Amino acid sequence: NKALRVLANPFMDLDKITAAPSPSPNRWSDKVPSREMTVEEIQEFITAFGKTAKLLKDAGVDGVEIHAVHEGYLLDQFTLKYVNQRTDEYGGSFENRYRFAVEIVKEIKKVCGQDFPVSLRYSVESKTKGFREGALPGESFTEAGRDMAESEKAAKYLQDAGYDMLNCDNGTYDAWYWAHPPIYMPENCNLEDAEHIRRFVDIPVVCAGRMEPGTAARSISEGKIDGAGFARQFLADQEWVSKMMDGREEDIRPCILCHNGCFNMCHYKGVPNDQDLSDSLHLARCAVNAETMQTDKHHIVKTASPKKEHIIGGGIGGMEAARVLKLRGHEPVIHEK
């Protein structure tokens, strides 16, 4: 919708200087360093979060989730000592570093009411050695960001500030593969840490990040977490939950954790965020599901005149052709030597 771009351009403009808790390198471009945010800008953000939440509530939304103390995003950067070098009320001490996130939830509760649910996306541990240097599973390293001891304190502190749920994984932009686990990360790589942090709060804790459904279900049934988060699998197969409930696991089209399609909203043809929203070919597509974000182009319609179709070769292309032809109502026959 091009009209929406008049209201808000949801992409980074790398020709403009970006802002951060303290002067720092830009994660996306070495040519444009980040400057320090002013207190006035921080207050403007806090007010904007409250106004936006109120608009959503008035529109009938039941609650909001703040993408905040998570994956090295802005509010998370404020909490991390290796990024936040401020000496004012938003830097230094534990309370000051978490002040931004605390004041946001308090503002939302003030304008929307104490009973309006506010969830927080939360990285239990940063798993980060330093700028652009993350840690791998099982690696011995010195944590530059939030370690477990601080996280235990922070989770309780954020709960007491007003957050109603923690939606957990791990990592920062410097260790992004914990929050968006690719194929080389182990299944359930964030579960142990989420289960641990659950013991320090009285609010629901959700875990995300390459969750195996059976393991997630057991953890929930045992009371170790309260929910599991899935995203990429829904791009691969929108009906996968229904298929599981019907005992049709073998029919589920699995996410292959490749990031070749779903990350293109951020990296468009190798250039971060340089993209036309109308170009559905590169808008959160999926390598294993052609219909994802391209339903107008690839929507399967039943034929009015079924035919017997012969396909020479039973490779990946031949099998996909047979599958689609069958869904369209034809009778495909594969010939393979």
What is each model feature region?
Residues 334-337:
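Conserved acidic E/D residue at the C-terminus of a beta-strand in Rossmann-like folds
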Residues 1-312, 316-332:
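Flavin-dependent oxidoreductase catalytic cores
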